[in-house]
Amino acid sequence: MSEASARIIIDKLLMESGWILPGSNSKVNVDAELTNESGRADYVLMDSKGFPLCIIEAKRGLKSPLDGKEQARGYADALNCRFVLLSNGIQHYQWDLEKGSPFVIDQFPTQSQLQLRQEKFNPSIDEDEDVSNDY
């Protein structure tokens, strides 16, 4: 399977998870082939405010998706993304750069699932605490 064939499957999985690809009449939340100083990311998934949330690195079917791990980490670091998806169209991995190793997934996460994971990791401070007294 070529990388182009893998991308067709990835596009389908993204749409099934509610992501909006370029060419749609709706507000797009996926950027395909975004180029930055680290190179070209195959896909960048955006959060609801339009900021990069997740990188997808696509490999052709005969290669392990994990072969793109360090390449994807470089793109994620350059775009300040915490999440990476690695796929060859057959196998798919999700990687939370803050929590450890990639793990196998059957479907891609939704925008709201990734945003919720991001927010749980970076909770906002909602309470004022009096720290004037010694303990």
Where are these regions (language model features)?
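ATP-dependent helicase/translocase motor core
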Residues: 1-54, 59-135
